[in-house]
Amino acid sequence: MRVAVVAMETSQYRDTVGRTRLERVATELAAAGHDVTVFCSQWWPGFDNQRERDGITYRAVTVSPTVPSFCVRLPVMLARFRPDVVHVHPTPASVALAAKTGATLSRAPLLTEWFGDENVPENRRAGLALQASDCLITPSELVRTRVRERGATADQTAILPQSIDMDLVSEVDAGEEIDVVYAHRLDGSANVESLLLGLAELRQKGWSATIIGDGPERAHYEQEAADLRIDDRVTFAGACDTEERVSIYKGAHVFVQTAFRECFATDLLWAMACGCIGIVEYQAESSAHELIEQRDRAFRVTNPQEIADKITESAGFERRTVDESCAEFDHAQVRARYEDLYEKQIEDAGLF
């Protein structure tokens, strides 16, 4: 299958979860034998107009992210590539519309990867780009609902989750045994207060906790742990790479999710795959609760006292280091769902 991915600004220009997700999908598809080309602004040095990396061809539409020039050149370049499917990042909306023109010239369906962190403006051009997409892919029901509220139809949307590496989960050694782990960038949406207040309720019990992540609010949270007199049992591990996180998760018994905003709770998923019991504090702007709806080793809570209660209750569950029920989220399984979606869209496009 020939797949054209369109992202004027790749993660080399602007590192966001949505861009990284689209690029990871491209990498997975290329590894599975598909012909994948990313049409983007040039991010590599030199004068070559394309670059090969991880089995993907990156083709420069423009030297820098210049919207007018990019939009003029993109449709013809897509038509010459003759893709079976075009997969686009939703911003800028003008680029998404240009991708639609190229897809139409190629007689290929246009799919839009709408992760939820793109900050798409609510204007006429963005609305046209949304309506022009044959399928809008979101990571969760929360984001799907937001897209529907902007005018997308139910048939026009699909939910495909973030993916994880179950082989890595199996291979990495478990870290030191701890009771509770939390992971999120320590910013204004982290809401570590709920966890710390819950832990403070258990001050008289023996427990240990690790907080993974760094950010502008780290000093504030460290001071709060000290004010609650639990800083001797809370370790702030800072930013950790994926392998380090997996090791910590495999040594932990409970993962507590309290962040105010999550398009998809990826760290919660990794932790549950590593055997952790999931405790999710419901937040209106977070999709985390969606991950635990059908799971036995998980609890949904609404306040710090309930967090404390469920941490205590979790002591009655056995410790695990791998949960094979999360295999449905493995990279290969999610990639197969993208392939199925592509094939369906190609088939539907061929009917008209």
Q: What do the predicted segments below correspond to?
A:
Residues 1-45, 50, 343:
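N-terminal subdomain of nucleotide-sugar transferases
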Residues 104, 110-138, 249:
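A conserved, positively charged/aromatic
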Residues 117-119, 132-170:
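Donor nucleotide-sugar binding/catalytic pocket of nucleotide-sugar-dependent glycosyltransferases
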Residues 172-199, 327:
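Conserved donor-binding/catalytic core segment of Leloir-type glycosyltransferases
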Residues 222-240:
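Nucleotide-activated donor-binding/catalytic signature segment of Leloir-type glycosyltransferases, i.e.
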Residues 239-240, 247-252:
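Short alpha-helical donor nucleotide-sugar binding micro-motif in glycosyltransferases
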Residues 260:
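Aromatic "clamp/platform" in nucleotide-sugar-dependent glycosyltransferases that forms part
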Residues 277-282, 286:
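Short hydrophobic beta-strand element within catalytic cores of glycosyltransferases
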